[in-house]
């Protein structure tokens, strides 16, 4: 059996790079002794960063309402268009794109198909075994797993370095929802996303600013997500646009994996043994 590492094979790597320090401002010209004295300059402004917007409880409640609705969905299909910026050493930004199609049947079935110009990856989970398949190379790896979908993303990331697309969709509406360490939360009004009126919210957590557009009305589905990395002075962003199909009729075979002819099994390599 072939042994390969799978660390980060599903992640779209869009991290920013370091930058040279900015040029300091020029010193002011000297004042001539023959000139009349000018009025004393104003006191310098504080160098402290401006205070963030307060945490609006209504914005947090909107996330909780969205999460509660997501937890009611037994089957759904989410199609995601992802674009993300990579920052070069000289500060120039490159935009990369990928797509993902995620089919879900709660509590424990999933099929995710991820595609970009650089790679193709399929992740299949039937409630007993999780399989990673590389269709272009015809390699597949599998590991036993029996937990629900809200635990799948974290376990794959922690043990194998595999990133599940839109993994937070399974956490919203649970005690594990990422609501901690918020320093800013605000309602930014309404926008239209692909013809659908959405409520626009903005949040700050640590070195991350993120915005979410949630469909207005009885089905508060997340339609668009923008994440900004504040730890990088270039502020690179990733943008996810999500299209939904609710209650599709999946056959059980959708979540089963049969190795194609000529496919080779490759052993999962946990991160701790790499």
Residues of each region from the PLM?
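Bacterial N-terminal signal peptides that target proteins for export
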Residues: 1-8
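Bacterial signal peptide processing site
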Residues: 18-20
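Post-signal peptide N-terminal segment of mature Sec-exported envelope proteins
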Residues: 23-55
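C-terminal motif of bacterial Sec signal peptides marking the signal peptidase cleavage site
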Residues: 14-16
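N-terminal mature ectodomain segment of secretory-pathway/periplasmic proteins
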Residues: 54-139
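Flexible, processing/modification-adjacent segments and terminal tails
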Residues: 41, 49-50, 54-62, 90, ...
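Gly/Pro-enriched, hydrophobic low-complexity segments
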Residues: 81, 116, 131-132, 141, ...
